[in-house]
Amino acid sequence: MIQSAVARNYDTIAIPMMGTGATDMLVSGMPGVLGWWSPDPRGIIPLDGLRVTRSLRQSSKKFEVRIDTCFEQVMRGCGDPARADGWITSDFIEAYLHMHDLGWAHSIEVFDRAGSLAGGLYGVRIGGFFAGESMFHRQRDASKVALVALVDVMRDSGMQLLDTQWCTEHLASLGAVEIHRSEYLRRLKGALDGAARP
């Protein structure tokens, strides 16, 4: 487990590490061991390359999008113990709640018309860079609607790099691509050095 003192100071480790292109994740089969990874190739979603189908546009009309109103609930949705290969533990949630309190970690939440949390995503923002950590849905298309909203917010605020870490088949269907680590690090430097609006 990430010890409580470490969880409270996790931002002092995570933010500098993310600035080098590393990403954190608990190591499978080794409870409590946190690893830092720098995948090569690296998955990103170009902000002008998100694929939004007509059916997704229609689906989005059924939802309301909010930002940073229920960060913990989004993390718990992403960390649902019923999900296969779950890696988001209560200690991990505590660490990210601290980073949220400090203004580093953010969530995009999607609510249905009844006011229930239908899905969302969370990640870490540093300047013009956003590291998408995880997303979930309880209703069809809700996580995709959150991703569309994130890309819109990033474009509107002048952000430059949406890091997905790995390029899964699901993310590729939404426009994620793989780039070599050297290209990723070049883009990361530009995003960290660039001026993005809050």
Language model feature labels by segment:
Residues 1-198:
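N-acyltransferase acceptor-side catalytic subdomain
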